[in-house]
Amino acid sequence: MADNKRIVLAYSGGLDTSVAISYLKERTGKDVVAVSLDVGQGGESLETIKQRALACGAVESYVVDARDEFANEYCMKALKANAMYEGVYPLVSAISRPLISKHLVRAAHQFGADTISHGCTGKGNDQVRFEVSIASIDPTLKAISPIRDLSLTRDVEIAFAKEHKLPITQTEKSPYSIDQNVWGRAIETGFLEDPWNGPTKDCYSYTDDPAFPPVEDEVVIEFKEGVPVKIDGRDVTPLQAIEEMNRRAGAQGIGRIDLIEDRLVGIKSRELYEAPGAVALITAHQELENCCLEREQHRIKRDIDKRWGELVYDAQWFSPATQSLNAFIEDTQKYVSGEIRMVLHGGRAVVTGRRSDSSLYDYKLATYDSGDTFDQKSSNGFIDIYGLPSRVAAARDVKFGNGIEVPKNTVE
């Protein structure tokens, strides 16, 4: 039976969720259990975050080391889908919310809570991601957000934190909202809300300035069925692969993203991201797919990848549609094995070599030199058949006076 005196809170250690603990206690009279996940975000130690939750009034606070789970089951799905929302954003925050939601539901079951709370505002995507994910796992649980439901602004939150002496470092002079994990880092609010303002150096943490790179870094990444398994000949787990590429690509300033983004809630927002490891790995994975996927399969997968990214961005990780797309994507990866060589330098990850036993690239068919096995005479019949619909349609257009106009000869 649910204990109505307890609420499970998704706790990040930041301003919104620290304020949420006190607000929940004051407004509901219920005890708050704070849940924090280690998804490779680094920064403050989890012990520090745990103690802060307790200092802010949580009755219990515990953390879950979910780094390998996040890398294996979430980042790798995003990698196989070459997930880039609107062509540039590798879903840094979007893929972590379903994992966090799963552990929140588990904690709610463990502690007998009937309510899960988060610290999201009413303008962001994450409120939708948390609540839709929670409902997809256990529709009997209630989800609330004191920050959103009370329409609290950031300056009011800061004042509340000061008044209640909550141990947070955020100030009115440094009001950035940062979300980070091993897949990347998101920075928003503050002066960045004016889209004309350029990012300053203090915005960045995962990447160095690409204008002043160190010497170029050559790396060879080996994939097995779409998953990185070796870097420069050394065995790596997915987590280790992401972490190493974060360091190496980040040192070269790779993965800085600055865009106006279409949010799920219907507004446009200015977003700043750093995702050096994700960008480098996706670049390598895409090139290996270029070698290993059959043409029509590849064309369809590019469409599927785009739709997968949109669904996951739009809080549909657990939806039937996403699960069906996962099945297609996973099937395409059975031959995506091989090595990609890249040069990392000055903000760019450039592929310089690729090899795979399952590659569909056939040198003898592709070469223009001696040894060419492509029968060029076959092209005549192919063109006749391929161009037949165009010829028939053109004849019809000419008949009705709608043929394509050709410029008259003006040469005298």
Curated annotation (Swiss-Prot):
It catalyses: L-citrulline + L-aspartate + ATP = 2-(N(omega)-L-arginino)succinate + AMP + diphosphate + H(+). Pfam families: Arginosuc_syn_C, Arginosuc_synth. L-aspartate binds at residues 121, 125-126. Keywords: Amino-acid biosynthesis, Arginine biosynthesis, ATP-binding, Cytoplasm, Ligase, Nucleotide-binding. GO terms for molecular function: argininosuccinate synthase activity; ATP binding. It comes from Bifidobacterium longum subsp. infantis (strain ATCC 15697 / DSM 20088 / JCM 1222 / NCTC 11817 / S12). InterPro entries: Arginosuc_syn_C (IPR048268), Arginosuc_syn_N (IPR048267), Arginosuc_synth (IPR001518), Arginosuc_synth_CS (IPR018223), Arginosuc_synth_type_1_subfam (IPR023434), AS_cat/multimer_dom_body (IPR024074), Rossmann-like_a/b/a_fold (IPR014729). One of its GO terms (cellular component) is cytoplasm. Its main location: cytoplasm. ATP binds at residues 10-18, 119. GO terms for biological process: argininosuccinate metabolic process; L-arginine biosynthetic process; urea cycle. This is Argininosuccinate synthase. Signal peptide: none annotated. The keyword DNA repair does not apply. The keyword Iron does not apply. Pathway: Amino-acid biosynthesis; L-arginine biosynthesis; L-arginine from L-ornithine and carbamoyl phosphate: step 2/3. L-citrulline binds at residues 89, 125, 129, 177, 261, 273. Its EC number is 6.3.4.5. Transmembrane segments: none annotated. It is found in: Cytoplasm. Belongs to the argininosuccinate synthase family. Type 1 subfamily.
